[in-house]
Structures are given as C-alpha cells and as structure tokens.
Amino acid sequence: MQTIFNTADLQKQLVKIRANKLSVGLVPTMGNLHGGHIRLVEEAKKLSEIVVSTIFVNPMQFGEGEDFANYPRTLGKDKAKLEAANCDILFVPTVEEIYGEGLSAGTVISVPDLSLDLCGNKRPGHFDGVATVVTKLLNISRADQAFFGLKDYQQYLIVRKLVKDLSLPTQIIGVKTERETNGLAMSSRNNYLSVDEKQKAEVIFSTLKLIAEKIIAGERNYVALEKIGFQTLQNSGAEVDYFAIRNDEFLQTPTLRNRNLIILTAAKIGPSRLIDNLLLTI
C-alpha cells in the first residue's frame, strides 16, 4: 500500500492508474478504523480495481463542544488494518492541504433540507462540513465509485444528493452496517464505552427492531410508534436526541402510501452519542 500526503502526488499517481484504464474506488474516513471501515474497503475491492482510502479528521464537521483536538489519531494501527484489507493507496492530507485558505475563507457546500433535520438539527453546520470535504475528496480523486456506510444514512443521502446536484461523475455506493455480536452498530465512539455501557447500548438496535416489528405487523400510527421508541430508550437510561420514522428516500414523514421506510435514532450512552437505523419494506 502506498501512503500519500499531498494532493499533487495523489493526482499524479491517479493519472498513471487511469492511463492503464483502471477504475478507482474511494473510501473516505476520519481514521480510528473499525470493522465497518474495513467492510467498506472490502466492498470497494469487489467493484473497483484500485482502492484509495482517505484518513482526514475534518475540523469543519466538528461543532461547538465537540472536541476536534482529542479525536483519536491512530495512523499506525489504521495503516496496518488497511494493508491487511489490500487497500492500494492511503491518502492522509493535512488540514492545510484541504483548507489552504482557512476554514472561514473557503467555499462551503451546503445541501438544504436533508441537512437540517435529525442529526443536522442537533449538530448545526455538521453536514456542511461533511458535504464540503466530501466534494473536495471527490474532485481530488475523480473516483469512479465512493463507498459510505449506511449507519450514517442521513450522510449517505446528503452525499448522494450533492453528487447529483453538482453533476459529479462518481457513483455513490451505500454499504450495510456492520454490527458487534450484541447488535450494536460498529462505531469509533464505541471505544469510549465501558463494558457495562456497551451492554446497555444493546437497547438501541433492539428498540429499532421492536418498532420495525410493530410496523410490519400493520401498525401505521407513526407518531405513536416514535413515542414508544423514544420512551423505551429513555427508560433504559439513554439520553435520546431523536427517534424518527421516515421514508427512505428524502427522510420525510411517511404517508400511508410509502412502502420503503427507515427508523432512525441518536442517543447518548455514557460519553458517546450513538446513531443507528433500520431499513424496512412494508
């Protein structure tokens, strides 16, 4: 695996790769890698001839009270994991490389509507940071495909929309959520949980499944079901940001005609804000 630290060197390498008519798959990450990230690389290997993974802790998507400085930087361990997964190129740019004019002076990409609700409501400006850095990475790499985990479903839809709206040629591919043995969605934030908190966090996925079962059984009072989900998590001791049932395409409140739904939640357990979702067809 080749590790590259600046944009010019990456683009020179990609010119050579494209001269050989090889397809490029991009896996953007912030590092501190876990099994979910590695699954993205594995899926990219299936569909792309050359896989480029990026590690960039993006300051633009950290809000007030979210500690950018203390986000885990584990480059050595991450490189070993990517090499084991047969990643071809690792791109590790600095903040200066990505935001040469500084965070406040550069262009910001904003995806309206989708960015304002759910996690966007609780983390204002977060998705502008995501959209901006993803646009930069797609422009730098000119990847044929880019791979995103469906655990961050709102982010996945936002990226898919910005690619469509900006006429970018990259195909955005969502990859199924990887889970711990207890059902907890894999996340870098799980590292902050104690053994007891990890066990307690099982309630997130079990509550999503509970509400999904009620919908599949024919219940259609979505407001009431959201309240049940919220209360179930709250009763377990979780600090719940939201529990929502939406259509899977635009994250709007579903009508009775909608058949493809998603149940989404964000809840704080111990020090970690955890998100998860469950897609279902009725």
What is the meaning of each model-derived region?
Residues 228-282:
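Phosphate/ribose-recognition catalytic cores of enzymes acting on nucleotide-derived substrates
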